[in-house]
């Protein structure tokens, strides 16, 4: 099995190495899809290196966006709310709904069987104690990302439809899945373009010099495909 996987990666790598220079985003989307040769529906990921220093609060790049073609995966949603909002959350399709019992499970059992947590503002006093567990994993409800809200039905609908959160890490890198290998090249391109436009829009005013330092697209088991930065900036206008 290892030899087969190694041969697949080698073939995929040779396909990418044929490109001497970075390619336009649309071509990169097709190449990334072509390099996905594993026996499962690989994720297609967009990786950015940004010219920011996240250790400075005014250079943190974070946000959320609903990808035009969704993410291609089922998203498990936990809603932490008082009883008055729990029925609304259940009817909107939340996978787990409650409050005290889930806070207890997370604290005592380190239970994390969900992708997104939504909380209503009135319970954040209780939910806040989960910050040390959920925060480092990017699961803590946050007003800026729309996951602290009284409009739980709308929030659930957006997340299930393909809303994602993104945040630059301490080294200025941003890694975000933008679809699956089963997507068409056009769908992958549209998702990547939407995310890039949002990241460009969020450029911190204090970030000097080159902002988009590198852009690559890759399948889970495939090599990175380099994307031409100038073409991305041109298309984002």
UniProtKB/Swiss-Prot annotation:
One of its GO terms (molecular function) is rRNA binding. The keyword Secreted does not apply. Pfam families: Ribosomal_L1. GO terms for cellular component: large ribosomal subunit. Keywords: Repressor, Ribonucleoprotein, Ribosomal protein, RNA-binding, rRNA-binding, Translation regulation, tRNA-binding. Transmembrane segments: none annotated. GO terms for biological process: regulation of translation; translation. The keyword Transcription does not apply. NCBIfam families: rplA_bact. Belongs to the universal ribosomal protein uL1 family. PANTHER family: 54S RIBOSOMAL PROTEIN L1, MITOCHONDRIAL, LARGE RIBOSOMAL SUBUNIT PROTEIN UL1M. Binds directly to 23S rRNA. The L1 stalk is quite mobile in the ribosome, and is involved in E site tRNA release. Part of the 50S ribosomal subunit. This is Large ribosomal subunit protein uL1. It comes from Salinibacter ruber (strain DSM 13855 / M31). The gene is rplA.
């Amino acid at each position: 099995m290892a030899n087969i996987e190694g041969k697949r990666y080698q073939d995929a790598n040779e396909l990418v190495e044929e490109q001497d220079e970075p390619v336009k985003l649309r071509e990169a989307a097709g190449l990334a899809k072509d390099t996905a040769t594993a026996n499962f529906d690989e994720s297609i990921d967009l990786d950015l290196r940004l010219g920011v220093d996240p250790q400075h609060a005014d250079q943190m790049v974070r946000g959320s966006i609903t990808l035009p073609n969704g993410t291609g995966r089922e998203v498990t949603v936990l809603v932490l709310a008082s009883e008055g909002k729990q029925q609304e959350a259940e009817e909107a399709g939340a996978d787990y709904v409650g409050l005290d019992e889930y806070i207890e499970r997370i604290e005592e059992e380190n239970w994390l069987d969900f992708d997104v947590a939504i909380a209503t503002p009135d319970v954040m006093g209780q939910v806040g104690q989960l910050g040390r567990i959920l925060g480092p994993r990017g699961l803590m409800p946050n007003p800026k990302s729309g996951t602290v809200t009284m409009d739980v039905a709308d929030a659930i609908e957006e997340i299930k439809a393909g809303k994602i959160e993104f945040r630059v890490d301490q080294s200025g890198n941003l890694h975000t899945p933008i679809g699956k290998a089963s997507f068409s090249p056009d769908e992958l391109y549209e998702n990547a373009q939407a995310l890039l436009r949002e990241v460009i829009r969020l450029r911190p005013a204090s970030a000097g010099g080159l902002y988009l330092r590198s852009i690559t697209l890759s399948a889970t088991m495939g090599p990175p495909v380099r994307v031409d930065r100038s073409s991305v900036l041109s298309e984002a206008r």
